[in-house]
């Protein structure tokens, strides 16, 4: 639906981010939010797949020029193609929905609900559902792994040899029972909730934390 019949919600917001990496090789940018969304927002952090395996079907979730959320579906396999300066996944035609000018940068999910790319460009619009090109996550991985591979989002941590491909959907849901400030206290008793949506059984994990003295 290109003509939105309602506005998106504005009661849940966060603002500010730092640019960690960017490259035209796959038209990728990695941003770190300046603040963590509150737990009562029920934010879902998507998993990702850096294997480079061709997807059998795809979904794009986007907010064209800040419009209310749109979802586009392709029921067929995406192909590999070069678009401009980027190595991309090519969507020949959307089966349900389309992208629009202003959808660039939106994520592409594979059949396992994992991010495999981000929208670079193409001819798709409200009047045309063909030819979209998404920069490939696996091509971006050498640029991203120093940030994603060692911070716990993959749980296996840093892999300097690049010998492992990751397909994990574990995410931090919430950290509770941590007071905003401590005075004359020697211990705290936080509660950390981890959700595993992946196919790998988690038997252990390491959590790194720090406190700011002020």
What are these regions, as identified by a protein language model?
Residues 123-124:
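A short acidic/small-residue loop/turn micro-motif
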Residues 28, 55, 103, 167, ...:
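Short coil/loop residues immediately preceding or within conserved phosphate-binding loops
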Residues 4-6, 128-132:
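Surface-exposed intrinsically disordered loops and tails
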Residues 32-37, 93-99:
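A structural micro-motif recognizing beta-strand termini
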Residues 130-169:
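A recurrent domain-boundary module in secreted/ectodomain proteins
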Residues 1-88:
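Serine endopeptidase catalytic core focused on the charge-relay Asp
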Residues 97-119:
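Catalytic nucleophile loop of clan PA
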Residues 165-214:
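Extracellular/luminal regions of secreted and cell-surface proteins that mediate adhesion/ECM remodeling
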